[in-house]
Amino acid sequence: MPRNIEPLDLGIQIPYHFRCPISLELMQDPVTVCTGQTYDRASIESWVSIGNNTTCPVTRAPLSDFTLIPNHTLRRLIQEWCVANRSNGVERIPTPKQPADPTSVRALLSQASAITGTHVSVRSRAAALRRLRGFARDSDKNRVLIAAHNATEILIKILFSETTSSELVSESLALLVMLPITEPNQFVSISSDPGRVEFLTRLLFDSSIETRVNAAALIEIVSTGTKSADLKGSISNSESVFEGVLDLLRNPISSRRALKIGIKTLFALCSVKSTRHIAITAGAPEILIDRLAADFDRCDTERALATVELLCRTPEGCAAFGEHALTVPLLVKTILRVSDRATEYAAGALLALCTAEERWREEAAGAGVVVQLLLMVQSECTERAKKKAQKLLKLLRDSWPDYNSFANSDDFGCSSQVVPF
């Protein structure tokens, strides 16, 4: 085989042995398989997992052992070559973090859950949890590996049995919310236990902002993953839980993660119809509108608007949002500005408000909503959004010029019922 092959897109020749035989790309994390052939880790892992391939791609010999051994020598040579060719636009490949070893994961979980024994202490258990968190931060693969070793059950036990140790609570909670959900009902042991729900609620007021955010994240995970309506209601049937979550959104120094987790959790809690009045009493309408007018990104804006629409489906919600001076202008401005989903939720909230009181119909018309709605009907937004626009146009017919010329067309023939999203 030739020592060098034709360049890809760098304008220079890449040494043949620096390229992965599968992807033909410069290797970022070279590993050697049992046949002695070296590949880029991502490529050989994909080769083995897709189609259940059990042969070496180059030699066609059976892969009797799937252990991947890092080729540090080759990786250093590639890094040196990258540095030597920096003037040609080649960036040095980073030194990859090695994936977690199953044996190490088992040992660390055992150490973290140990209660008695030689050298067992809160400090040693917390250190084990921190190492596991480090593995979890590195990659999705590590998170899946940790979860596969019954980590969720172990961490739940630590979290709710070691309540006197703030260090163990914060570390176990932080790791728990990083792991993937492997079973639909794996958090039922939390949602079905009022004491555990109450403890999580108390953590929303912890002195550590990280613990508060992680507590909110776990509440969102538990609420979303709970199928029983009664258990969902038991989680959100508390003004304290709403106050704690809303405080994450209210805090002027909230981090981007705090805002994202806060709105996700608020939406999950407000999905329970029977407890939406608690969110309204806790001040959700004012905080949502203030945040929407300030610093949500697109995804968070969509979720916040969906929450606004949910709360506007109650009379007290309409009243609270309607009294905020920015609500109607902000909702009108959002239409066709952010995304199709945001447009749909904004239109749904406006529909609820305009159905409730004439003064909000007048305010919406004054803010230019009729033109926005006419554009919505002709746009490529969702059918649900168009139906909401059509209903709003019916309600606002007195604000239309020449209403009778097209009010009865097929485009606007629909009922006035709020369409669920």
UniProtKB/Swiss-Prot annotation:
CDD domains according to UniProt: RING-Ubox_PUB
Class in the EC hierarchy, top level: transferase
Keyword Transferase part of the UniProt annotation: yes
Biological function: Functions as an E3 ubiquitin ligase.
SMART domains assigned to the protein according to its UniProt record, in alphabetical order: Ubox (SM00504)
InterPro entries: ARM-like (IPR011989), ARM-type_fold (IPR016024), PUB22/23/24-like (IPR045185), RING-Ubox_PUB (IPR045210), Ubox_domain (IPR003613), Znf_RING/FYVE/PHD (IPR013083)
Domain of life: Eukaryota
Catalytic reaction list: S-ubiquitinyl-[E2 ubiquitin-conjugating enzyme]-L-cysteine + [acceptor protein]-L-lysine = [E2 ubiquitin-conjugating enzyme]-L-cysteine + N(6)-ubiquitinyl-[acceptor protein]-L-lysine
GO BP terms, alphabetized: defense response to other organism; protein ubiquitination
UniProt xrefs under Gene3D superfamilies: Leucine-rich Repeat Variant, Zinc/RING finger domain, C3HC4 (zinc finger)
Annotated protein name in UniProt: U-box domain-containing protein 25
Pathway participation: Protein modification; protein ubiquitination
Protein source organism: Arabidopsis thaliana
